[in-house]
């Protein structure tokens, strides 16, 4: 099997934070959003990019390479025994996998045909018909909640309403959902923002967990290595920040 091709910038093996069990996470390159705090800025462009080495001495690397569905599946299926023993599987991430619809659909379909559990990590910003087409192929939706509607476009680069409409749609169709919430101190962690997360977790059928993802500055170094002139900076989350977030969201089973 060869199948269609797309630009992949990483394949992470033995991942344990992107769905249940031991997983392989396939990162597709290209995203329509521009989150200020993005920790993988090399995922934004839809084309391969040159990135300086971390030590500044080694040759630069090219981030992203064209791979077929068959090539990706050859890597994914190597660890099927681990998936079967741990309840794991394949997670498609990005970038934004819904912006790579044909490749994502073909890859998920291939995994399902081999009995591999599937998850997709997504912002939910995509035409409804794409999401509807993927519903039979996705066992778990890892759905980003980045900011409340009032400040969403300012921080992320797109309106929140289509994302919230799509979330309500998959919930109405019986999807299993994990809400993933990147929180940046002083940026998107206001009382209003935390109340928005709590409401979604309580009112959206199918939400099995809320994952809080505290900001970390990984993206700062990557932006520098990509040669970008300016980039976002924010403080690390303190333990007090994290405790406040957990208390406000009131999710006993969050990570």
Positions of PLM-derived features:
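N-terminal [4Fe-4S]-dependent radical SAM core
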Residues: 1-68, 78-86
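Short coil/turn segments at secondary-structure boundaries
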Residues: 60-67, 95-98, 233
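Conserved AdoMet/S-adenosylmethionine-binding subsite of the radical SAM
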Residues: 73-219, 224
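Auxiliary Fe-S-binding modules of radical SAM enzymes
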Residues: 1-20, 185-255
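Short glycine-enriched, charge-decorated loop/helix-capping segments at active-site entrances
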Residues: 58-62, 154-159, 226-234
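Short alpha-helical interface patches
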Residues: 58-61, 69-80, 228, 239-248
């Amino acid at each position: 099997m060869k199948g269609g091709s797309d630009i992949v910038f990483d394949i992470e093996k033995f991942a344990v934070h992107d769905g249940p069990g031991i997983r392989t996470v396939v990162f597709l390159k290209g995203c329509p959003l521009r989150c200020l705090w993005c920790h993988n800025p090399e995922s934004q462009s839809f084309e391969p990019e040159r990135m300086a080495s971390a030590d500044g001495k080694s040759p630069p690397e090219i981030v992203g390479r064209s791979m077929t569905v068959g090539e990706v599946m050859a890597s994914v299926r190597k660890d099927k025994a681990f998936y079967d023993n741990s309840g794991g599987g394949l997670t498609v991430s990005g970038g934004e996998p819904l912006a790579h619809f044909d490749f994502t659909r073909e890859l998920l379909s291939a995994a399902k045909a081999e009995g591999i559990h599937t998850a997709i990590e997504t912002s939910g910003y995509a035409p409804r018909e794409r999401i509807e087409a993927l519903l039979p192929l996705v066992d778990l939706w890892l759905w980003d909640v980045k900011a409340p509607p009032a400040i969403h476009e300012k921080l992320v680069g797109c309106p929140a309403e289509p994302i919230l409409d799509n979330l309500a749609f998959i919930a109405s169709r019986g999807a299993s959902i994990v809400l993933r919430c990147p929180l940046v101190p002083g940026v998107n962690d206001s009382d209003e923002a935390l109340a928005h997360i709590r409401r979604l977790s309580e009112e959206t059928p199918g939400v099995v967990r809320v994952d809080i993802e505290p900001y970390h500055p990984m993206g700062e170094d990557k932006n520098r290595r990509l040669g970008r002139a300016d980039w976002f900076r924010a403080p690390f989350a303190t333990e007090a920040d994290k405790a406040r977030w957990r208390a406000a969201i009131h999710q006993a089973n969050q990570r």
